[in-house]
């Protein structure tokens, strides 16, 4: 289920429903995790999300295992999306953003979001040419970001 541009209260109610259906408790820790994702454009690893929550809510007793379990639950419910970095793990973002694609730096892991109407139209044309009913797509471009390219150039001098 697509959840683009959903208000936080609606998202929170959906999350509570998913927890109830799974026989799980709604906790302050889980709410803070969802709220952190909602109010950020960051692509988080479980560890970086855990650290952000600990920094923002130092008195909140949240464990890294809770972060992992909650992210998995949210991903299964299609409330978050992830980008896999193989053995280096995943980075997560809330699935409430309008459609976008990603450029991913192979050196530093930086993720740049972009949307290009020409690419979107071309994908639709390709699908049509093949009699394919396009229902969605995920595009990830891999390469080396400008910062890493600039650092390589400085080293060569």
Curated annotation (Swiss-Prot):
<dbReference type="InterPro" id="IPR036388">
    <property type="entry name" value="WH-like_DNA-bd_sf"/>
</dbReference>
<dbReference type="GO" id="GO:0042802">
    <property type="term" value="F:identical protein binding"/>
</dbReference>
<feature type="binding site">
    <location>
        <position position="43"/>
    </location>
    <ligand>
        <name>Zn(2+)</name>
    </ligand>
</feature>
<comment type="similarity">
    <text>Belongs to the Fur family.</text>
</comment>
<keyword id="KW-0479">Metal-binding</keyword>
<dbReference type="GO" id="GO:0000976">
    <property type="term" value="F:transcription cis-regulatory region binding"/>
</dbReference>
<dbReference type="InterPro" id="IPR043135">
    <property type="entry name" value="Fur_C"/>
</dbReference>
<feature type="binding site">
    <location>
        <position position="120"/>
    </location>
    <ligand>
        <name>Fe cation</name>
    </ligand>
</feature>
<keyword id="KW-0963">Cytoplasm</keyword>
<keyword id="KW-0804">Transcription</keyword>
<keyword id="KW-0862">Zinc</keyword>
<feature type="binding site">
    <location>
        <position position="137"/>
    </location>
    <ligand>
        <name>Fe cation</name>
    </ligand>
</feature>
<dbReference type="GO" id="GO:0045892">
    <property type="term" value="P:negative regulation of DNA-templated transcription"/>
</dbReference>
<protein>
    <recommendedName>
        <fullName>Ferric uptake regulation protein</fullName>
    </recommendedName>
</protein>
<dbReference type="GO" id="GO:0003700">
    <property type="term" value="F:DNA-binding transcription factor activity"/>
</dbReference>
<feature type="binding site">
    <location>
        <position position="101"/>
    </location>
    <ligand>
        <name>Fe cation</name>
    </ligand>
</feature>
<keyword id="KW-0408">Iron</keyword>
<dbReference type="GO" id="GO:1900705">
    <property type="term" value="P:negative regulation of siderophore biosynthetic process"/>
</dbReference>
<dbReference type="Pfam" id="PF01475">
    <property type="entry name" value="FUR"/>
</dbReference>
<dbReference type="InterPro" id="IPR036390">
    <property type="entry name" value="WH_DNA-bd_sf"/>
</dbReference>
<feature type="binding site">
    <location>
        <position position="99"/>
    </location>
    <ligand>
        <name>Fe cation</name>
    </ligand>
</feature>
<feature type="binding site">
    <location>
        <position position="113"/>
    </location>
    <ligand>
        <name>Zn(2+)</name>
    </ligand>
</feature>
<dbReference type="GO" id="GO:0008270">
    <property type="term" value="F:zinc ion binding"/>
</dbReference>
<dbReference type="GO" id="GO:0005829">
    <property type="term" value="C:cytosol"/>
</dbReference>
<feature type="binding site">
    <location>
        <position position="108"/>
    </location>
    <ligand>
        <name>Zn(2+)</name>
    </ligand>
</feature>
<keyword id="KW-0678">Repressor</keyword>
<feature type="region of interest" description="Dimerization">
    <location>
        <begin position="97"/>
        <end position="157"/>
    </location>
</feature>
<feature type="binding site">
    <location>
        <position position="102"/>
    </location>
    <ligand>
        <name>Zn(2+)</name>
    </ligand>
</feature>
<keyword id="KW-0238">DNA-binding</keyword>
<comment type="function">
    <text>Acts as a global negative controlling element, employing Fe(2+) as a cofactor to bind the operator of the repressed genes.</text>
</comment>
<dbReference type="InterPro" id="IPR002481">
    <property type="entry name" value="FUR"/>
</dbReference>
<feature type="binding site">
    <location>
        <position position="93"/>
    </location>
    <ligand>
        <name>Zn(2+)</name>
    </ligand>
</feature>
<comment type="subunit">
    <text>Homodimer.</text>
</comment>
<keyword id="KW-0805">Transcription regulation</keyword>
<feature type="binding site">
    <location>
        <position position="105"/>
    </location>
    <ligand>
        <name>Zn(2+)</name>
    </ligand>
</feature>
<feature type="region of interest" description="DNA-binding">
    <location>
        <begin position="1"/>
        <end position="96"/>
    </location>
</feature>
């Amino acid at each position: 289920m697509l959840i683009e541009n959903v208000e936080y209260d609606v998202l929170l109610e959906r999350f509570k429903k998913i927890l109830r259906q799974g026989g799980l408790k709604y906790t302050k820790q889980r709410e803070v995790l969802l709220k952190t994702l909602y109010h950020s454009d960051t692509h988080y690893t479980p560890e970086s999300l855990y650290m952000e929550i600990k920094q923002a809510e130092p008195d909140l007793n949240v464990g890294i295992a809770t972060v992992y379990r909650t992210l998995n639950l949210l991903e299964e419910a299609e409330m978050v999306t992830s980008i896999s970095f193989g053995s280096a793990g995943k980075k997560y973002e809330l699935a409430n953003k309008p459609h976008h694609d990603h450029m991913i730096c192979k050196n530093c892991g930086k993720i740049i979001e972009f949307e290009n109407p020409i690419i979107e139209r071309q994908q639709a044309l390709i699908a049509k040419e093949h009699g394919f009913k396009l229902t969605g797509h995920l595009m990830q471009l891999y390469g080396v970001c400008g910062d890493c390219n600039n650092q390589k150039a400085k080293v060569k001098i």
